[in-house]
Each structure stands twice: as structure tokens, then as C-alpha cells.
């Protein structure tokens, strides 16, 4: 049987209150708080590399960054994001090399049931 995490990233119905998902979300909130308070770009990049599923070597993200889990986000080489990036990574988000993201961009993967 698939875990709630496996169901979630497959786009199936899942229980967000699952202990594994709650632990991932809590860890993500802690890293989010640390990143959004960090003023040193190198330390900020180190937090992102620890937080996200994978990243290239060269990346720069301005604050505020808001995500659900972080582990489902994959960034290529030479990634830049301007202010107020939101990435709701219920399902994987993959951005390739040499990407520049403007201010106030949102990558939203959740989809709530449309049929009762």
C-alpha cells in the first residue's frame, strides 16, 4: 500500500494529517523561518540546498520564500528568484538551468477534489 507521501506526490487523495507529512511540513517551516531571516546570501543558499530536494551550485533567492515541504522542489544550475516566491510543492516542482523568476511568482501544485 502506498504511503500518504507517495499518494500526495502522485496527485491522489491523501491525508495531510499523516505523521510523516506533518513532520516534513514542520521541518520545512523551520527552514523557511531560518531562510527568510537570513541576510547573508551564502548562508541563505546553504539553507536552500539543505531544504530543497535538489539544487544546482549557483543559486540566489531573495526573501520571502514560502513552500509546503521543500523536498519536492528541484532547481537547476544558475537559478535566481526575485522577492516573494511561493512554491506549494504538494507534487514535484522542477525548474531547469539558467532560470530567472520575477517577483511575486507562484508555483501551485495542489488541487482539491472537484467532485464530491
Identify what each model region corresponds to.
Residues 1-58:
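Terminal amphipathic alpha-helical/low-complexity segments used for targeting or macromolecular assembly
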